UniProtKB/Swiss-Prot annotation:
GO terms for molecular function: ATP binding; enzyme regulator activity. One of its GO terms (cellular component) is cytosol. The keyword Chaperone does not apply. GO terms for biological process: nitrogen fixation; regulation of nitrogen utilization. This is Nitrogen regulatory protein P-II. SMART domains: P-II (SM00938). It holds the Pfam family P-II. PROSITE patterns: PII_GLNB_CTER, PII_GLNB_DOM.
Amino acid sequence: MKIVMAIIKPFKLDEVREALTAIGIQGLTVTEVKGYGRQKGHTEIYRGTEYAVSFLPKLKIEIAVASELVDRAVEAIAASAKTGQIGDGKIFVYSIDHAVRIRTGETDSEAL
């Protein structure tokens, strides 16, 4: 079992969700986050004053998947989130030691 976590541009959420649904991913968690990397940020003008925007709005998507689905999930996210511009995001994969479905008590792969 693995967690696939991706940081993406907010306007790409629907495309990513559709791509994951197409490969059989049944659920995901989305969190609004802010951050920066190579993109660094930008400046904006508000009421005639220039402001430096260091942290850019992004979305963090997390999905719990069986190990055999990880590569397909990563490929689906990468293909659907890509714009070809700096700031497209990152994908991270890490292991789950134990999972429990609270409602039924099912554990590990049955809980996914």
